[in-house]
Amino acid sequence: MKIAIDAMGGDHAPKAVVLGAMKAIKEYSDLHITLVGKEEEIRQYLTSDERITILHTDEKIESTEEPVRAVRRKKQASMVLAAQQVKDGEADACISAGSTGALMAAGLFVVGRMEGIERPALSPTMPTVDGKGFVMLDVGANVDAKPIHLYQYAVMGSVYAEKVRGIENPRVGLLNVGTEDEKGNELSKQVFAMLKDAPINFVGNVESRDLLQGVADVVVCDGFTGNVALKSLEGTALALFSMLKEQLMSSFTSKLAAAVLKPKLMVLKDKMDYSEYGGAALFGLKAPVIKAHGSSNDQSIFSAIRQTREMVAKEVIPTISSVMEKESLQ
């Protein structure tokens, strides 16, 4: 199995990418990794090149650049070359912690869209209080969705949750303003009617306040709604941890309490740590394309590689294609 990784993408590249790749190589004997980027910088952190190949390029896409224009103009950028490796059959999948918009553009223009899928979806795995997490799609790839798009998202998310996350008969919920069947705007009502007859375990409408309680294994929404929900959850979590830290450090007594509570607080922090869940899969493409978090450390990169390996090994893309074909959506 071969995975191409944009070694120059992310806040801590190339160090975090290289260290994460080496950790994955030690963990999985069937894995071969191509690191795409500046060879001189990559080799500063590469202590072993066992099953690791470097594809040198001096060019990269900056987060400040317009995504589509950058992908079209910078054919030799590390992210674009990683996607090209997939298109040329040199890699089974690719990963980048770089610009989300640029990776979506590279996925569409280079890797290519799966036949029958109208719009790809960006799908991270979000934490829950029980530590199991849930898959959420779409969170920004397609802000102007049609009912058929969300139907396809539900099917793709269900296949992923079962194949990669190991959840038998995953529960699929539709993000809405209430749990009653008739709730929502016209888009939500049409999607609800379609999902009732879909070949999935549809559990109905779910509200954003219940997401972290694990009300569903897969949560479906349009990209605009999903992005707002995602940012709200992230912001709330950061604010709560910040307030908690402020209170625990406010006096000598509270500092003593913090010392006693530290093991429990670390467990809580680990439960909410995105680095354990891998990256956000871009569903609807011909091959797995994974967006790692921009601030990924080496553990985050390792988790993204593990996730990508599972997608390839469990044949997620062929399975999605097969299910879609049976549903006469292709």
From Swiss-Prot:
Q: Catalyzes what?
A: a fatty acyl-[ACP] + phosphate = an acyl phosphate + holo-[ACP]
Which BP terms from GO are recorded?
A: fatty acid biosynthetic process; phospholipid biosynthetic process
Q: Does the keyword tRNA-binding apply?
A: no
Tell me the keywords, alphabetical order.
Answer: Cytoplasm, Lipid biosynthesis, Lipid metabolism, Phospholipid biosynthesis, Phospholipid metabolism, Transferase
Q: Which GO terms describe its cellular component?
A: cytoplasm
A GO MF term: phosphate:acyl-[acyl carrier protein] acyltransferase activity
Q: Which domain of life is it from?
A: Bacteria
Gene3D superfamilies in the cross-refs? Isopropylmalate Dehydrogenase
Q: Which residues cross the membrane?
A: none
- Where does this one sit in the cell? Cytoplasm
- Primary localization class, coarse: cytoplasm
Pfam families of this UniProt entry?
Answer: FA_synthesis
Q: Which family does it belong to?
A: Belongs to the PlsX family.
Its assembly, as annotated, is: Homodimer. Probably interacts with PlsY.
Please report the name of this protein according to its UniProt entry.
Answer: Phosphate acyltransferase
Gene source species: Bacillus cereus (strain B4264)
Recorded name of the encoding gene: plsX
